[in-house]
Swiss-Prot record:
Any one GO molecular-function label of the UniProt entry: zinc ion binding
InterPro entries in UniProt: Cys-tRNA-ligase, Cys-tRNA-synt_Ia_DALR, Cys-tRNA/MSH_ligase, CysS_C, Rossmann-like_a/b/a_fold, tRNA-synt_1_cat_dom, tRNAsynth_Ia_anticodon-bd
Binding annotation for ATP: K299
'KMSKS' region (motif): residue ranges: 296-300
Xref: HAMAP family: Cys_tRNA_synth (MF_00041)
Gene this chain is encoded by: cysS
Native source organism of the sequence: Bartonella quintana (strain Toulouse)
Protein name: Cysteine--tRNA ligase
Enzyme Commission number(s) of this protein: 6.1.1.16
GO cellular component, one term: cytosol
Amino acid sequence: MRKLRFYNTLTRKKENFTPIDATKVRLYVCGPTIYDYAHIGNARSVIVFDVLFRLLRYVYGNEHVIYVRNITDVDDKINARAACEHPELALNDAIRQLTERTYSQFQQDTMALGCLLPTSQPRATDHLEDMRSLIERLLEKGHAYKVQNHVLFSVRSIRNHPHYGAFAKRSLDEMRAGARVDVAAYKREEMDFVLWKPSAVGEPGWASPAGIPVLGRPGWHIECSAMSMAKLLAPYGGGLTCDDPTANVFDIHGGGIDLIFPHHENEIAQSCSAFGTERMANLWMHNGFLQVEGKKMSKSLGNFITIRSILESDFFEFNGVLTDEMKQNWAGLSARFSMLQTHYREPLNWTAQRLVQSSSELYRWYELLCFEREEMEKNEALDDSVIDALSDDLNTPKALTLLRKFYKAGNAIALANGMNLFGLLRQEWVQEVECPLFMRKISLNSKFIDQRIAERLRLIHNKEWAAADTIRDELAAKGVILKDGKDPQTGERTTMWEMRRL
């Protein structure tokens, strides 16, 4: 079995990855809160963990990897946006309209980015019973308390096992200093956080846990603990009915670096306290921040970019007539290619120029694949060097450098295999002879070009200049540029060719 090494946020070092069960490799990633269209920061996380999903599937087998990415569909931001957009509707109806629209758009956007569907995408509102049960377990074990129709987690209860703040590498004093000044009077300590809260009149609410007599809704952190339990523990022998702590740990938990504190710190506190474990997951992976043109992305700065706005932008010219779907899929793959050129843990600076450059390079890769359409029918294994690069903490920049070498060497099969693992290859574009993305490539392949060059050299040798020029012009019209030279050893005329750069 191939050795994988990843940087573990939990230990702050690279570690060999050994799954708990190689036939059931389990990955959980925090997904979006669906109150608005997803932005390119969301896109980075989605793309990074899609590549990880693809790598795990390659190593352990497609059917042996379980990837769960949750959907948060109950949140104060959702309530506020729904009320603003649909003031004519009752709030629950407005929320339903908003979340269905944004959920559908998120699915379309991620598909255009070349992402595989996760194994499961649980929605918070479908797991309220799991949340209530988990909260009641925490109350039973003395890790939570009820006050004024709230349930709060008691940070003091778990200071030593595991130490609260250890994941984020923060002391309690540091966290207290960063806490809000106006701490709710009903909290025992300022660092205690909400597991469940009452709903105001007109707000969405559900039956509360532990006999609380009013309707309420869950806190953000308990949602992920409950959904990961429901999807990655309970189906595999763990969960609240299991007394074995070792059965209540899964393999990998991922998300953006901004989630380390407080969200992931609080997830760990809840889950470890409920199950008596020292770890919630063995490996924690976080992608770095994203900036736009060197600045923090912010609506106030006017540089807030949604995935949808990129998919619908015209930043690249094509020869053929494209459908809107094809344009959006091309834009999505271009954005994906652009993001993967930065290591997932490093900050990423998104620029319009970089997107165009990435799109141009990706187009040239597809040109080669279209030329070598017949060669593409051969079945060859993925080059080990690409897997080696990705196996070392998902080193996508190094792996893409290898793909560039394949392109320069004209090795279409190796290039295509690598692109496929990266989620950059749409087979239908290569297989379709008259794909409008690459209209000038019709009936062209390297063998055809070589034959035409050989014929041109024969004509030049016979001094049939006009006929030789006709072949040159014919190939130029198809985007093929000829470069004449001489063999340094024999002195004979030679001709190299390349595709015109767009």
